[in-house]
């Protein structure tokens, strides 16, 4: 049997890269057939899947050299991605096929497991946000716009291969899925904002609570991203977030009205206004201060 090394770099633009015997240094075998004893190098930030006739038969998600042995039982090296990979392999590895030919067809897929950064987003239309302030009894819905960048990571390469990029012939690049992820992310913002609001976080304070927002988005997107595609949000950055001028003014007016309903605060506000008026009068050379004295508004 021959020996060859199949190694493909999973670049930031590539989610999946495939390498097969026909494009390797071993020319003694047939195209898309991996020789027994072949050595496959797996780099840091990569996962490796061996697919035979459209079925996943080997998984290596930790760096090092993997020796392909046709006589061994299917194996899973899950690395730091945990036992969920083994569970997924047990569930799908033996029963999911992708229309492979009856003949022997073997391919090596390299999955990018690094954080994929620089994914921009922006709300084309305002997103509802509930503003709650229990101190003043404020509970009102407003609309906000926001923009920024987020990053994601393929945390379950088996699910990503199975449900997203199965049997690509060359590379599956991020641009093939980015628009779909962005659309689903923007749809998830409203329920994620609801979770943030329940924590008592105001919309203006969200840039300081992006960790909580990323966690809330992962919860909302778990069915479509983590459980279906094996993808999770790593970070969610907010460059800016703002309500409309009308909504901001409405909040200020409601806050002011709530303050004035408090007798103590209302009295303090009146006293402050009187004090300001007296200071202005005292600075008036025409003697307006005497008018305040006559009305009993100047204290000694």
Task: Kindly give the residue locations of the regions a language model identified.
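N-terminal hydrophobic membrane-entry segments
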Residues: 1-245, 299
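Assembly-interface segments of oligomeric complexes
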Residues: 244-300
């Amino acid at each position: 049997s021959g020996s060859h090394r199949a190694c493909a770099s999973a670049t930031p633009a590539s989610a999946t890269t495939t390498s097969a015997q026909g494009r390797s240094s071993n020319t003694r075998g047939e195209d898309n057939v991996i020789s027994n004893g072949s050595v496959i190098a797996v780099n840091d930030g990569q996962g490796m899947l061996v697919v035979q006739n459209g079925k996943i038969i080997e998984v290596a998600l930790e760096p090092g050299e993997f020796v392909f042995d046709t006589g061994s039982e299917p194996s899973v090296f899950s690395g730091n991605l945990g036992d969920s990979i083994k569970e997924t392999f047990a569930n799908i590895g033996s029963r999911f096929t992708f229309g492979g030919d009856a003949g022997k067809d073997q391919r090596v897929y390299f999955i990018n497991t690094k954080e994929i950064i620089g994914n921009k987003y922006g709300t084309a239309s305002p997103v509802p946000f509930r503003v709650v302030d229990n101190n003043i009894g404020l509970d009102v819905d407003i609309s906000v716009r926001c923009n920024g960048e987020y990053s994601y990571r393929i945390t379950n390469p088996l699910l990503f291969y199975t449900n997203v990029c199965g049997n690509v012939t060359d590379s599956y690049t991020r641009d093939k899925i980015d628009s779909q992820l962005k659309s689903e992310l923007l749809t998830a913002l409203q329920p994620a904002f609801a979770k943030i609001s329940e924590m008592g976080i105001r919309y203006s304070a969200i840039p300081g609570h992006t960790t909580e927002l990323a966690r809330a988005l992962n919860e909302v997107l778990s069915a479509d991203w983590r459980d279906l595609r094996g993808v999770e949000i790593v970070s969610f950055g907010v460059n800016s977030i703002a309500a409309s001028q009308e909504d901001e003014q409405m909040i200020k007016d409601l806050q002011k009205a709530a303050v004035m309903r408090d007798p103590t605060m209302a009295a303090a506000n009146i006293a402050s206004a009187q004090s300001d008026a007296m200071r202005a009068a005292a600075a008036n050379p025409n003697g307006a201060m005497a008018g305040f004295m006559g009305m009993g508004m100047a204290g000694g």
